[in-house]
């Protein structure tokens, strides 16, 4: 709902879909652990794609890391050292990305990274700035789940509310963009 809270009626509808035999998989910019816990407590499919596609959680201690935290940390250190007001955002621990407060000019950071040949991607989810490995996005992460579970594009409905959801929309037959 924009405040980080779960809309209980929406969760109830997702649980009903799960009970009807559909896979309901959370794909988020938040940590995959947060999404996995939501799946457990919410009664949906216990698979989660987090960190904007960089991490897949399928069990309590089973994580597939698609991104490289070391490269993202190097990029953060460079940005922090050269641009004022760069701050880490207090979030649940990440395994593949760095999350920053939206307190600086993102385009300035992009230029700095290009000038220093650091191959990472910056994105703005409107919640935070994210530093991810190249090619890592929600669509890429979810496509790995599609391969694993033999899910066809025609069987995917994606729901999102951020520019970071566009890559997920591209792997789905049907997409719903919410106007939060």
Where are these regions (language model features)?
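Active-site phosphate-binding/coordination module
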Residues: 4-92, 180
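Conserved acidic, metal-coordinating active-site core of Asp-based
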Residues: 76-172, 180
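Short active-site oxyanion
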Residues: 19-25, 44-46, 97, 154-156, ...
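Short loop or secondary-structure boundary microenvironments that flank
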Residues: 3-4, 28, 102, 135
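Glycine-centered loop/turn positions within well-structured domains
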Residues: 54-55, 129, 176
């Amino acid at each position: 709902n924009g405040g980080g809270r779960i809309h209980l009626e929406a969760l109830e509808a997702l649980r009903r879909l799960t009970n009807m035999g559909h896979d309901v998989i959370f794909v988020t910019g938040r940590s995959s652990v947060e999404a996995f816990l939501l799946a457990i407590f919410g009664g949906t499919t216990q698979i989660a794609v987090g960190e904007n596609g960089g991490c897949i959680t399928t069990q309590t201690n089973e994580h597939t890391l698609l991104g490289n935290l070391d490269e993202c940390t190097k990029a953060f250190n460079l940005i922090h050292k050269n641009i004022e007001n760069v701050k880490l955002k207090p979030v649940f621990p990440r395994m593949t990305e760095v999350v920053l407060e939206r307190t600086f000019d993102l385009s300035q950071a992009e230029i700095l990274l290009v000038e220093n040949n650091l191959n990472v991607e910056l994105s703005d989810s409107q919640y935070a700035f994210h530093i991810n490995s190249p090619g890592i996005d929600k669509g890429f992460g979810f496509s790995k789940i599609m391969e694993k579970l033999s899910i066809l594009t025609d069987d995917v409905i994606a729901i999102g509310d951020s520019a970071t959801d566009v890559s997920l929309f591209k792997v789905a037959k049907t997409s719903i963009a919410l106007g939060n």
